[in-house]
Amino acid sequence: MAATLDSRGVPHPAPRPMSSEEKKVIFASSLGTVFEWYDFYLYGSLAAIIAKQFFSGLDAGAAFIFALLAFAAGFLVRPFGAIVFGRLGDMIGRKYTFLVTILIMGLSTFIVGLLPSYATIGVAAPVILIALRMLQGLALGGEYGGAATYVAEHSPHGKRGAYTSWIQTTATLGLFLSLLVILGVREGMGEAVFNDWGWRIPFLVSILLLGVSVWIRLSLSESPAFQKMKAEGKTSKAPLSESFGQWKNLKIVILALVGLTAGQAVVWYSGQFYALFFLTAQLKVDATTANLMIAAALLIGTPFFVVFGTLSDKIGRKPIIMAGCLLAVVTYFPVFKMLTEAANPDLARAQATAGVTVTADPATCSFQGNPVAREIDFRSSCDIAKRYLVQNSVSYENVAGAPGSKAVVKIGDKTIEAPVGNVVNLKFDEGSAKEIAAFKKSVAEDLKVAGYPAKADPAKMNKVLTVLLLFWLVLLVTMVYGPIAAMLVEMFPTRIRYTSMSLPYHIGNGWFGGLLPTTAFAIVASTGNMYNGLWYPIIIAGVTLVVGTLFIRETKNVDIYAND
């Protein structure tokens, strides 16, 4: 049978092992993803320490919130980085653009380790920290699109899914690297020293990873597809207007976001970060144990990025990604409920035998998910009751009470009326403070009697089943994420590929995915049900499933050398 030809008139090569040059391309491109997730896990793991170092002029609660907002700033600006660096990548080339992105990203991480604290330079410290986070977010906005485009344009026909899927595996490497450095430094110098200044070391040692990344990327050549296009004088002079100003391309960008990356992102974050937060915040599993179980699930699951990437070269990208979204929609609720039974059986039993309800006048109940509200802002009887339950991760059902009535908490067959708080000079007055303290004590005692545990009991935990359930969540991640880079690359023409694929990827992963933990826990806090946060990823994944199935075509046989 005659060999098929690409748009260059070159026969598609027969299957062969990966060459040393291709291995170098994948390795160099993947280092940026390692850097991205190394920093991500560092900042997330050290958020409490960073809050004390850079936001110490605020009260403890507000400091932690602003530390998380600084964290979120990096996500929010990623789409803008996609526009800036995507444009450069389509105009001057992939190689030098994603060399610039890793320099900015790496130096931003390194400088955090040098940044003086609030105690030293005052308000300049948090301002500079947020600026560094935004710089890094901008660079990250150009990094993934560059890496995916570069690897795909170096990949032989029939191997793009397999080759680009290696980029996704490095997120796990970033996690393990950050855990190794944090644990090593913390154990080596002790908790007190680590909290004082030792936390800087994990940020500072990132300069070594940056040095290796830059050295390797400098030795790479430009992608064949871009070289061909440049030689023919077909590079885009205005990739932004071509990508987003022409409906035929803008339509594909919108479809890529709604029908691919939004669902991929929420499945990704649900399977790793939300699962971790659910274990620690809702199921009260010790943080070290939870991290180790997540790490075990990732270790088992990571090879499946390549498995599904390779499989997508044979059966297509679309069916695998859509199947991952479908399985997420169908299995999230039962899997997370099984997690409760496996990781904290005492809690599962208490919820089944002594459910908690809050009966209150809905008009007196505030939104419990407000991240900047102070304790005194929750002063109604309803707010005081729900606030205590939310802070102690106790699920409850809402029952509408009579207008003007005080809130009543029912635990099994016990009922406790919540007081109303009276605020004087920005604090609860003495009488209110005593009543609130007595209410909290009564609720705590009744919860204990009803069997609600203060924390998960390691002796009763089914660790094997917990890891298997977490592995299932990671497996769904590999299904939606393994083939995604190849599919995004194949959806857009070479001349505007970097720009066009970067924006939907980073809106999906920066906004829909990056803000998932905050959004999901706000839903939990507002509704009182520990599982209701799952509605956010389920709805988004469901929308992606419908739009992707109906409106996105298969791309595995697309000729990426075509410029039309």
Regions found by a protein language model. Give the residues of each.
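Central cavity-lining transmembrane alpha-helices of secondary-active solute carriers
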Residues: 68-87, 106-108, 173, 295-308
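Glycine-rich segments within core transmembrane alpha-helices of 12-TM secondary carriers
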Residues: 139, 161-186, 209, 335, ...
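Hydrophobic core of transmembrane alpha-helices in multi-pass small-molecule transporters
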Residues: 115, 121-141, 346-361, 460-479
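Multi-pass alpha-helical transporter architecture, strongest
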Residues: 213-220, 335-342, 540-564
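Low-complexity, proline/glycine-enriched hydrophobic segments characteristic of transmembrane helices
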Residues: 337-468
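Extracytoplasmic gate region of multi-pass secondary transporters
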Residues: 43-44, 249-297, 335-336, 363-399, ...
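Extracellular/periplasmic helix-loop-helix junction of adjacent transmembrane segments
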Residues: 47-78
